[in-house]
Curated annotation (Swiss-Prot):
Disruption phenotype: Cells lacking the core proteasome prcBA subunits exhibit reduced growth and persistence in mice. They are also attenuated in interferon-gamma-deficient mice. They also display increased sensitivity to reactive nitrogen intermediates (RNI) and increased resistance to oxidative stress. Transmembrane segments: none annotated. Pathway: Protein degradation; proteasomal Pup-dependent pathway. The keyword Acetylation applies. This is Proteasome subunit alpha. NCBIfam families: 20S_bact_alpha. It is found in: Cytoplasm. The gene is prcA. The modification N-acetylserine is found at residue 2. SUPFAM superfamilies: N-terminal nucleophile aminohydrolases (Ntn hydrolases).
Amino acid sequence: MSFPYFISPEQAMRERSELARKGIARAKSVVALAYAGGVLFVAENPSRSLQKISELYDRVGFAAAGKFNEFDNLRRGGIQFADTRGYAYDRRDVTGRQLANVYAQTLGTIFTEQAKPYEVELCVAEVAHYGETKRPELYRITYDGSIADEPHFVVMGGTTEPIANALKESYAENASLTDALRIAVAALRAGSADTSGGDQPTLGVASLEVAVLDANRPRRAFRRITGSALQALLVDQESPQSDGESSG
């Protein structure tokens, strides 16, 4: 007589966690950090069409690491939620904490109820409304729905430990955009060097996706930095030239 295969709930959760962590670790890294003018997002991403960084609403941005189809589905759902709430109530009623909580609830439900967890890690960031002086808010949401409020920076995907260690050593509050980008790129290079046996790779315009939430912009704070505008900020980095321009 054969008995049905049994797995304890604890073992099932451990296996789900391991699956999700391995999937996220295979992804290229993403960094989000607060700087003097708002929040800077920097991702290792050679693709120009499969973007890891996005606007969610007027003062709220999104970044993710992991499986693209899964986090893009979450991104679109967040935009729809924000648009609906902003239309039904008031645009100022849409906050980063609110969207982070929605993502945490969604990922927690998927982790416990679906056959396979999402292999994603998310960051939701918000800057103050134009003319206000509130500090930027950074939220990290993990594959199981855990949520954390990070005061300075978030690191996701790839080998996070060397990147986080580099940021702990070099991060400076109220840094300029140029300095913040230099700090973020140097940290990403430290993570890439750890996985490539110590060689410091070149991260330039062609291999980076960069955007900011600019607290000094009225209404919509999100702005991508591409092409020659990014190249100008990377003058100290060895990077290839690109013909694109900064977009609004």
